[in-house]
Every structure is written in C-alpha cells, then in structure tokens.
C-alpha cells in the first residue's frame, strides 16, 4: 500500500477516533469530519483543512478501500476500513490511529490517550502491540512504526507511525540520547532527575564531612 499524505492520515485517523468516541454521530458527514480534523486539542500537528482538501483525501482513500461512503443517508457520510485495509489487530489499529492524530508518544502516553478508544490492561500490553507492529510491515513490506531515539530530559522513548513515510518525523528527531548530559539552561529537568541529582549532592557532602573529621579539620 502506498504512503498516506498528511491530509489522508488526518482524515482516516479522525474517522477512527469518532467511530469509537462518538458512535451515535458515526459515520461522519463531510462538515463534521472537517471539524474533527481541525480540532485544536488532541492533535499534533494542528491542521486547517478545507472541505475541498478533506474531500480530495476521502476520494483517494475510497480508491484504496480505506474509506467507504454510507449509502443509507441523504447527506453523504463516511466510515473507515482501516483495520481490514491494513490487516492489523484492533489494539494495533488503535495505536496507529493515535499516532496519526497526536504525533509521537511514549507507551505510557499511548495507554492514557487510548482510554476512550480501547482498554489496554497495562503499559506492557501497549509495548507488546508496538513491538508486533515494528516486527511486521504492511502488505508491501513497508515498516509501520518506529521507535525514536530517547532525547535528553525524557525517561521513555517515543514511538511514531511511518504510514506517511519518514520525512514527517524530522521535527521530532533530535541528536543525542537519554544518556547525554543535560544542559539545565536549554533542557528541562524532570522531577526524578532532580531528586537523583540532589541525592548525589547529599552523598558527596557526607563524604566531604567524613574526610574533614578524619583529618581533624573544621569546615568553614
């Protein structure tokens, strides 16, 4: 299957989201779909699709059998066929949908953000589904997800989808790893890191005090 464009990914993922979170309003009309695509919350990046752009994405997705038009309504309404189209399991489809909507996320973030979509038992089950996606590809053999390098200031590695290719990942990829030194003027320090630094400082102060005592010196 060919790579999706950003507009196609947003349209597809929005249909996936609304099917689970507002089933009474699903399938979606074009107007409702555009509003969902352009939400200011739970979207990364935020987009400003026009109805014409959304319709163009729908037309292409229909040709790939990833979107269908409901036939029981006077107003055209659309529904997705993602899980069958990509041949993935339900939890895998949920994770790919969230990654398309919200950008790269850690397993913990994915579990939290999936609450209204699907109930993962724990973070380990999220990690298992991601690992399965990483180990396989789509029907053309192309990779579907990638684990990004851990950046300074982050405890967990983030995951990203590859359904639109790798070029969209550039803003999220930074040089270095979580083991690199952190510059407090440019990188945020987490609470856990601050606690570990304070513990090391306290330990060093105790060692210095012990040395002064053994040498019979007094600290200024």
UniProtKB/Swiss-Prot annotation:
The species this protein was found in: Polaromonas naphthalenivorans (strain CJ2)
Matching Gene3D superfamilies: Winged helix-like DNA-binding domain superfamily/Winged helix DNA-binding domain
PANTHER family per UniProt: UPF0502 PROTEIN YCEH (PTHR38768:SF1)
TM ranges: none
Pfam families listed in its UniProt record: DUF480 (PF04337)
InterPro entries documented for this protein: DUF480, WH-like_DNA-bd_sf, WH_DNA-bd_sf
Family recorded in the similarity comment: Belongs to the UPF0502 family.
Name of this protein: UPF0502 protein Pnap_3223
Source species, domain of life: Bacteria
SUPFAM superfamilies assigned: Winged helix' DNA-binding domain
